[in-house]
Amino acid sequence: MTLKLIWDKFYVSIIFVLTCIVLGIILMCTVVGGGSDYSEVNVNEGDSLWALADQYAGKSDMAKADFVSWVEKENNLSDGHVEAGDSVVIPVHKTKLLKSDSTIQLANQ
């Protein structure tokens, strides 16, 4: 079979498969490249969701109860319990968190 004969016989299938591949690549790039605009914070010893709400709720324009509910839902915390060393996503945009932290620490300090 020559390429011309294969093309003439299966051109619809070839175009369909190539279209699916291209759309799949676009979808993967969109999902992977999109990322989250929300900040991720590490939980310290003695922290709770309510302590995080006290610290960050003002930057998120949410009431503290709404803040805690959002964090529980987005981080799949059914009982609302977090432990030191956990990392949780909070409803504060990364740009807001970066703007409020105006101090710069050098690597050797």
From Swiss-Prot:
GO terms for cellular component: cytoplasm. Residues 39-90 form the LysM domain. Keywords: Cell cycle, Cell division, Cytoplasm, DNA damage, DNA repair, Septation, SOS response. The keyword Acetylation does not apply. It holds the Pfam family LysM. InterPro entries: Cell_div_suppressor_YneA (IPR022887), LysM_dom (IPR018392), LysM_dom_sf (IPR036779). It comes from the Bacteria. Its main location: cytoplasm. It is found in: Cytoplasm. GO terms for biological process: division septum assembly; DNA repair; negative regulation of cell division; SOS response. Belongs to the YneA family. Inhibits cell division during the SOS response. Affects a later stage of the cell division protein assembly, after the assembly of the Z ring, by probably suppressing recruitment of FtsL and/or DivIC to the division machinery. This is Cell division suppressor protein YneA. It comes from Listeria monocytogenes serovar 1/2a (strain ATCC BAA-679 / EGD-e). The lineage of its organism: Bacteria, Bacillati, Bacillota, Bacilli, Bacillales. The gene is yneA.
